[in-house]
Amino acid sequence: MNRFTTPVACLLAALLCAAAPSPGASPGRLLDRMASLNPNLRAFTATLHAHVAMKSFPFLSADLAGTYYYKQPDKYKVIFTSGVPMVAQQFDKLYAHIEPPSRWRDLYTLSTVSDDGTTTKFRLVPRKRGNVEHIDATADDRTATVTTLRWNYYNGGYAEMTNHYGQQGGNVVVASQTGHVTEPGYVADISSTIDGYKLNPALSDDIFAGD
């Protein structure tokens, strides 16, 4: 996995709609809600603006702009139209490697770390060995949205992201994100905003070719 491959994507893959749980809802039921929300959202495009500040050499700070594409069940793509090419080439890979909650049970060994009635913390261990040792995911029990993700790598590095949501056409979608990446020889802070959503456009699979 590319060193800048996972963090921000964090969670547009978790584009989730709000719904109130019944009292005492179990973590399993919460995950079911997370996996089945936004039932009418089949695809979208949106405008992405991102700021990346590298805290290690070469200490670049870059503003990027592009179009974000999503198509069910798990296709994600960012095509940048402006920004520093070197940074953009890394950044557009972020969104291609995030799996939605509907696939968590298939791809990870899943356990519940804690549930205080407001927030549930999950641990996801990949069933297939790769660079990620495990993922810590935090979900809001009321809205069934992924609020934070942290990828913990075998090399001792990590990437983390916090999601902030808004409403679009009756769906809850990511409006902004903040995050951080620390890996050997590479440290960066990330912030992004996503707006201009167009819901359920006809998207060709060719857009996602090569991902």
Go through each PLM region and give its residues.
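Gly/Pro-enriched, hydrophobic low-complexity segments
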Residues: T118-G210
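A short, amphipathic edge element
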Residues: P27-L30, P100-S111, G156-E160
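Short loop/turn positions at the edges of beta-strands in beta-sheet-rich folds
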Residues: N40, Y70-Q72, D116, T143, ...
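N-terminal leader/targeting segments and the immediate start of mature chains
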Residues: L15, A20-A53
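Bacterial N-terminal signal peptides that target proteins for export
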Residues: M1-C10
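One face of beta-strands
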Residues: F44-A50, L64-Y68, D74-F80, E133-I135, ...
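An acidic-aromatic
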Residues: A53-D115
